[in-house]
A protein has these predicted regions:
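N-terminal [4Fe-4S]-dependent radical SAM core
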Residues: 41-105
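Long terminal accessory regions outside catalytic cores
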Residues: 1-45
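Conserved small/polar residues in nucleotide/adenosyl-binding loops
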Residues: 221-228
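Short, charged beta->alpha transition segments
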Residues: 88-93, 115, 164-165
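Cysteine-centric redox/oxidoreductase cores and disulfide-bonded domains
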Residues: 197
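Catalytic cores of alpha/beta
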Residues: 216-220
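Core AdoMet radical
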Residues: 102-114, 121-135, 146-161, 168-187, ...
Length: 228
């Protein structure tokens, strides 16, 4: 975690040149083909000075609590993609079966605590919890019980009330995923985004798209976050 905070501080001070330096360093240290491919893509994306990734990183550093950013980064990056995926790959080679480093489940399922505990032992630390038909704040108790995991909480924007957002904000290992039925920043979406931003939370607008609205979704992706 100390290294994560140091990296964030370096990028704050050194700007995007330092970001490229970190990506180059990680690329040189990558051992597995998937890791090499990931950092090769990151290098390519950062070659363009007008890349939307620069504004994305700048926005993250300005609006997201640093402890939250580092916790999610370590839990997902190291726990999920480096250590966890390597452990699951070993077992997959023995079993001869494919594996996934991310698991989806229904938020509030009473079986989840036991399932998450069992998954941790196998190297699985990243979850997406579907709360689109319920109360997204139910994820808070699970996230607190498993601080080494990262939880993405998929929720309807109108369900992300200030009170529920406040409960989720107590968990540094949660990423909120407001689900948009179309690439449109409706009043409910904007209200949810403002509530999340007020708590310096990490969130990603998640859009359901098909061929008819894919281009519109790309424009939404490159737009600034909803503002007051």
């Amino acid at each position: 975690m100390t290294l994560a905070h140091r990296a964030v501080g370096d990028i704050r001070r050194g700007g995007f040149r330092q970001l490229r330096n970190y990506v180059d360093m990680c690329s040189s240290l990558a051992k597995r083909p998937q890791q090499k491919d990931f950092f090769a893509y990151a290098q390519k994306a950062l070659q363009r000075t007008d890349s939307c990734y620069y504004s994305l990183v700048h926005n993250l550093l300005d609006t997201v609590d640093e402890d939250r950013l580092c916790t999610v980064g370590v839990n997902m990056g190291f726990g999920g993609l480096i250590y966890g995926a390597s452990e699951m790959k070993k077992q997959a080679d023995v079993d001869g079966k494919p594996f996934s480093w991310i698991t989806a489940a229904h938020c509030g399922d009473p079986a989840l605590p036991a399932l998450v505990a069992a998954a941790e032992k196998k190297g699985s630390f990243v979850w997406v919890l579907d709360a689109t038909e319920g109360d997204p704040s139910e994820a808070a108790s699970l996230a607190k019980a498993f601080p080494k995991c990262a939880f993405g909480v998929l929720a309807a924007p109108e369900a992300l009330t200030p009170d529920r957002v406040a409960q989720l904000a107590e968990c540094l290992n949660v990423v909120v995923l407001p689900l948009l039925q179309s690439p449109e920043l409706t009043p409910d979406v904007c209200h949810a985004a403002r509530a999340l931003k007020a708590k310096q939370m990490l969130y990603m607008l998640t859009v359901l798209v098909d061929d008819t609205c894919a281009e519109e979704a790309c424009l939404l992706y490159t737009s600034p976050s909803p503002r007051d």
